[in-house]
Amino acid sequence: MDNNEKTYELAFNIIVHAGESRSLSSEAMDAAEAYDFEKAEDLLKQANDEFLKCHEIQTDMLTKEANGEKNDLNVILIHSQDHLTMATMAMDNAKRWIKINKKLQKMEER
C-alpha cells in the first residue's frame, strides 16, 4: 500500500469513528431529554471511546510527521478533520445538555 492509499485509509477510519461518536452523542442528548441520565452517560462514554480511536489515529499521524515521515495531504484527510471537530463539539454539547436536563428535572419536581 503506497503512502497515498494509507492516508486515505486513515482518513476514512477517522470519519467512521468520528461519525459514530457524533451519532452516540446525539443519542445521549435524546436520552437526557427523556431524563434517562444513566443511558445518556453510558452513550456519552461510548461516544468518547469512539472519539479516542480517532484521536489515536490522528496522534499517530502527527508523531510520524514530526519524525520525518510525510503524510499525503488530500481533501479526504481534511474532511476527516472536520468530522473529528464535529464529534468534539457534539460531545461537548451532549455534556451540557445532560446538565441542563438534570436541572430541568429538578425544577419540574418542585
Kindly label every feature range from the protein language model:
Residues M1-R110:
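Terminal alpha-helical segments
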